[in-house]
Amino acid sequence: MDVADWLRRLGLDQYEAAFRENSVTVDLLPNLTPDDLKDLGITLVGHRRRLLDAIAVLRRF
């Protein structure tokens, strides 16, 4: 799995460029915080919530 695939599966592929430009890798995903997501330009609360829920799943593995 790569970050672009993960974002596409979440229906949030519009953020692929932001994650790529900020060198966010699969290894970094579990460490992202709500503030990190805001810094990446994810301003919609629902999108941040969806990402944080998916990040929580990654933390379990």
Which residues are covered by each model-predicted region?
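Sterile Alpha Motif
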Residues: 1-21, 26-61
